[in-house]
Amino acid sequence: MKLTPVEQEKLLIFAAGELAKQRKARGVLLNYPEAAAYITCFIMEGARDGKGVAELMEAGRHVLTEKDVMEGVPEMLDSIQVEATFPDGVKLVTVHQPISAEVKS
């Protein structure tokens, strides 16, 4: 199977996001790369599902909370930018302050 560099990067992000998802499910606090991959994967999959840019920008802020990540990670992740593939093309999604202080219910 031949993959372009962009396809390889997307596959790597997906794999890292799935690993982070498994760790979060086990109650392991996510580090910086895991948190970034988790949120990035959420945005990429949401785009493929047909969600809009504005919807993903807002939803991306509530995927993880401070209780899901290691100390210091929220301060390091002040924004995430993802070039996601939507049904009508590739668009840039920017999520500011992606790790919320609120506790998910």
Swiss-Prot record:
It catalyses: urea + 2 H2O + H(+) = hydrogencarbonate + 2 NH4(+). It is found in: Cytoplasm. Keywords: Cytoplasm, Hydrolase. It holds the Pfam family Urease_gamma. The keyword Hydrolase applies. GO terms for molecular function: nickel cation binding; urease activity. GO terms for cellular component: cytoplasm. This is Urease subunit gamma. It comes from Bacillus subtilis (strain 168).
